[in-house]
Amino acid sequence: CKIPANAGNCNNHQERWFYNSHNRKCETFLYSGCGANPNNFKSEKQCESTC
């Protein structure tokens, strides 16, 4: 949860959630569909329960 979100480099854009450790909250970002890191969640609830 402390690493920055990684949008990846593919073209299958989808909204995902990541934990922003600077703001101390889960936020959305556009994920490309590949190249994810562990700070990548399908829902806000999943992000909040993990981080």
UniProtKB/Swiss-Prot annotation:
SMART domains: KU (SM00131). Disulfide bonds join C1-C51, C10-C34, C26-C47. Keywords: Disulfide bond, Nematocyst, Protease inhibitor, Secreted, Serine protease inhibitor. It is found in: Secreted; Nematocyst. It comes from the Eukaryota. InterPro entries: Kunitz_BPTI, Kunitz_BPTI_sf, Prtase_inh_Kunz-CS, TFPI/VKTCI-like. GO terms for cellular component: extracellular space; nematocyst. One of its GO terms (molecular function) is serine-type endopeptidase inhibitor activity. Pfam families: Kunitz_BPTI. The keyword Secreted applies. Coiled coil: none annotated. Belongs to the venom Kunitz-type family. Sea anemone type 2 potassium channel toxin subfamily. Weak serine protease inhibitor that has been tested on both trypsin and elastase. In vivo, is not lethal to zebrafish larvae. This is Kunitz-like toxin PcKuz2.
